[in-house]
Amino acid sequence: MSSFILAIDQGTTSTRAILFNEEAKLVHYHHVEITQYFPQGGWVEHDPEEIWDSTLLCCRNVLEEASLRAADIAALGISNQRETTILWDRHTGQPLYRAIGWQDRRTVNFCEQLASQAGVLAKFVEKTGLILDPYFSCSKIKWILDNIKGAYEKAKRGELAFGTVDSYLLWKFTGGKCHATDATNASRTGLFNINQQRWDDELLTLFDIPKSLLPTVLDNCAQFGFTDLDLLGHKIPITAMIGDQQAAAVGQACIKPGMVKSTYGTGCFMLLNTGDQIIHSRNRLLATIAYRLNDTVTYGLEGSIFIAGAAVKWLRDPLHLIEKANDSESMASSVEDTGGVYLVPAFTGLGAPYWDPNARGALFGLTRNTQREHIVRAALEAVCYQSKDLVRAILNDGANLTTLRVDGGMAANNWLLQFLSDILGVNVDRSRCIESSALGTAFLAGLGAGLFDSLEEMTGLWQADRHFIPQMDPKKREELYDGWQKAVEKTLTPAAPLLFP
């Protein structure tokens, strides 16, 4: 009997295929790095074909390396980088343009102009839970339709399909038979009404986007179709799709209201489970869908930071201050502090709670005594300070946070997590499986395939790897954070756009 689950985690800088057994234990994984393109300042793109090729390669290789066949796989689940936008031809399957990444800021002027119109901003926030920011898919779709010759006319004729990465991969896996997405990914487009759980005609009119572009929206556990026989040699049922941050929340067993997880990958994403309540933040966080099962919605409150692990990659690649990403841990711990240096990594603007798309990165406090170790440490500390920004916002919105569950590639850095616990003043628990997005996807795919009976049964399998407890003097904590706030204040643009009503 087939009992293995294949989870795909398609991320910003890499694609992973991870095998789990029926007890949700990680059996084997394979990953492939993918290319990001930066054709202009603030523009971030991917090659959709490379995303697909890397996904198929990972699936084939992980099966071969684990000495398994596709027939051994009971279910396949997909998690993905959210908001990243792809339009393709329904007849040929060819992408119309590169995938516009979630970090892309090219539509900032359009978003500002739209937000300045009377009543638009309040209506958008009420319907979507989001803000009018280039982060979300709606303005990216609009840009492609307006700037690629013939795109709008083809869309009006029903010849084009839109999808976030999950939808595009599903189309490719099923040989074009299924054009669908899930509720979590739909909720990040800026076109989905999270109150009514449907595409919103008024929002489509606002952005002048033909409804024929859009995929069908399904629950996170659903029958999404089967992989095409020619791809893996056997038809595997696709039983789950979910955005990567929501997948991580499920993988971290954050299924009860009040539970919080934070994922540290390219960016940092903190998600609070708010149960069946939509909480419109008073502190610039996003209302979103955490998951939807059996037509029942669980909502979340999310803070999004654009640059976390990407700051370490910046230290490695253009600056060559480190050779490998994991060098950052030893270098940060080799100095007592940053020597007064603060890095504000606003390379693509600042996300929550500032939402300033025009802010740009800055280093403060440099002296002749500044060493590269100080800058490396400042980059890691910046991730933790930004996390404290989010925690303060969550607390001010009424949550009670005593423990934070963390995952993602950066969570392997012990120094980072200890400093995180210190600066937050709360316990930090690292999951035994730091591939929480893949684990959550496997949980849901297994549920959809009947391998698990309930969400509670699955998440009962969650285990902590290590607990980090605050050790920093509270006065020192406040001094360091005060320095961060002053650095951010100097980085913000004088006339940051009004993104909230």
Swiss-Prot record:
Keywords on record: ATP-binding, Glycerol metabolism, Kinase, Nucleotide-binding, Transferase
Record: residues binding glycerol: 82-83, 135, 244-245
Gene Ontology, cellular component aspect: cytosol
Binding site for ATP: 12-14, 266, 309, 409
The keyword Transferase is annotated on this UniProt entry: yes
Binding site for sn-glycerol 3-phosphate: 12, 82-83, 135, 244
Activity regulation field: Inhibited by fructose 1,6-bisphosphate (FBP).
Record PROSITE patterns: FGGY_KINASES_1, FGGY_KINASES_2
Residues at which ADP binds: 12, 16, 266, 309, 409, 413
Pathway(s) the chain acts in: Polyol metabolism; glycerol degradation via glycerol kinase pathway; sn-glycerol 3-phosphate from glycerol: step 1/1
Function noted in UniProt: Key enzyme in the regulation of glycerol uptake and metabolism. Catalyzes the phosphorylation of glycerol to yield sn-glycerol 3-phosphate.
Entry protein name: Glycerol kinase
Organism lineage: Bacteria, Pseudomonadati, Pseudomonadota, Gammaproteobacteria, Legionellales
